[in-house]
Structure formats: structure tokens, C-alpha cells
């Protein structure tokens, strides 16, 4: 799946909106309530995206170019107790965020692998999350 949104803000402002804890929680909440990031976004690091109920995904920061590109490769589903299930629906999937800027407008493109049974949910909710990123970055 892939979605894009044009934002009247610099790449740096959009990047900060995506990945600073306070604003990440605001836009990611639309996808899965209470979602937050645990760990440091640094190439080669593993981080976790956990929802309010403690479930989520452990992912590898495979490629990171600040203010331009971030690629995650999902390693394992994470259960409420922190246990990781290696063979689960998100394992092996990719998720990327690309920012391109021109004439004061940044285009944010999010692309990701989604289990077939969740495609409808993400198609309905991810554009709303990106619109929230836009609102936050433009304020």
C-alpha cells in the first residue's frame, strides 16, 4: 500500500512531526490507539511500535536518511508482555517514509506491506493519519 500527502512545511518540520514522541503519538493514534515508539531511531537499531494495549511490532531501522527517508523492516510481532513472536502477520514486512520538498511544499509518501486481512482497515485509516501529520506540521 502507498499513500501520499502534500504539506505546506519544510522537510525538517514534517520529519520532526513524524518522529518526535508527542506528535508521533497524535498521528499514530488514528491507526492504533496509544501507539508510541520505544527505542532510538538510528540505522541498524531495533525499535518497537507499541499500542496502548501493549501489542505491536519490533522493527529494524534498515535505512535512515534524516529529513528524507526511513525504511523499517518488521522483525516480529510483540505481545503485551514484551514476548516476540517470530512467525506472525507483520514479520518480514517493510514500511517506508519518503519526504521530497519543492517550492515550500513537502510531499510525504508512506509505503508499507500489510497483511491481506488488514488492507481495508489501513486503506480507510492511513490517509486520515497522514492528514493529521499535515495538520500538525502546518500549525
Model-found features: residue ranges?
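A short, structured loop/turn motif at beta-sheet edges
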Residues: 7-12, 62-69, 98-107, 135-139
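Intrinsic-disorder/low-complexity, polar/charged segments enriched in Ser/Thr/Lys/Arg/Asp/Glu/Gln
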Residues: 1-6, 46, 56, 69, ...
Amino acid at each position: 500500500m502507498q499513500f501520499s500527502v502534500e504539506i505546506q512545511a519544510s522537510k525538517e518540520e514534517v520529519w520532526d512531526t513524524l518522529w518526535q514522541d508527542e506528535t508521533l503519538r497524535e498521528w499514530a493514534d488514528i491507526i492504533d490507539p496509544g501507539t508510541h515508539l520505544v527505542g532510538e531511531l538510528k540505522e541498524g537499531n531495533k525499535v518497537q511500535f507499541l499500542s496502548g494495549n501493549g501489542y505491536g511490532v519490533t522493527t529494524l531501522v534498515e535505512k535512515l536518511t534524516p529529513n528524507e527517508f526511513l525504511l523499517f523492516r518488521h522483525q516480529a510481532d510483540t505481545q503485551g508482555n514484551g514476548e516476540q513472536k517470530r512467525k506472525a502477520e507483520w514479520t518480514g514486512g517493510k514500511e517506508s517514509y519518503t519526504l521530497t520538498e519543492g517550492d515550500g511544499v513537502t510531499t510525504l509518501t508512506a509505503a508499507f506491506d500489510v497483511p491481506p486481512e488488514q488492507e481495508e482497515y489501513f486503506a480507510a485509516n492511513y490517509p486520515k493519519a497522514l492528514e493529521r501529520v499535515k495538520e500538525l506540521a502546518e500549525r
